[in-house]
Amino acid sequence: MAQAPSHANDTEQKKLLDILVNSASLSSGDLKALLVAMDNFDVVAKVFLLEGVPFVFSSKPMKYLIFREQVADRFEIGYQDVCIVGSAKLGFSPSPYKFGKPFEETSDVDVVIIPSEMFDNGTHELFRHLHKVGPALSYSNAESVSVDARDWRLHKEAVRNFVYENFNPSHLPENNALRNKIFSNISSTSALFLALEPQVFVSKIRCRIFRHWRAAEAYYVNTLRQLKKQLAAGGIAQETAVDVDLDEEDAAAAGSRG
């Protein structure tokens, strides 16, 4: 005989339904309440992180469509394979390391794009580069090997991103043709972005390339899972070497030097 749903499950589903139906936007408090009540974050990731009109275009949904079309045109993909994520999407950061931080002029606009061929090419280029980074391969397990800390981070981040089927072009060497093409494509949309009069004028637009939408969903579901763990622990996570992308670290360092 099937068991009746528990009161906890009823409460969890009612909380999710109330926010989905009655909320045009999501506050950091709403997101925290959802994460505390739930263990499956697939719907939350899809509805609030990957779909819908982002905070920066909340009063101008048609202008968001124009922006997506322009990005898609640069990368020769469909507009449906482009979306704004992160703090520019929600109005606050969903990152376990910056949770609740409001989106502001110093914030970057993060864009997800899904050109599968570019993911394959970029990953191949990156691992070919990593093959040449660091000391020569040693087959002696008895010998210790010294590796530059930044090179080790690059290896770890490349493997992490490959597991989640995404590619960060900033990990390629600066003289790499594919890196320069991607950066040129995404930076060329900055003037248009500002011309579309977003809620907040921003300094930089970045992109992360995913192999397919399922990979993007899995990546942001994991972000929510890590955020829930951190909230349960009672605070914001401390950034570690394998948790923060090198380009984010460089941006933070540049800001502190300024």
Residue ranges and their predicted role:
Residues A2-S107, I114-G258:
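Catalytic core of pol beta-like nucleotidyltransferases
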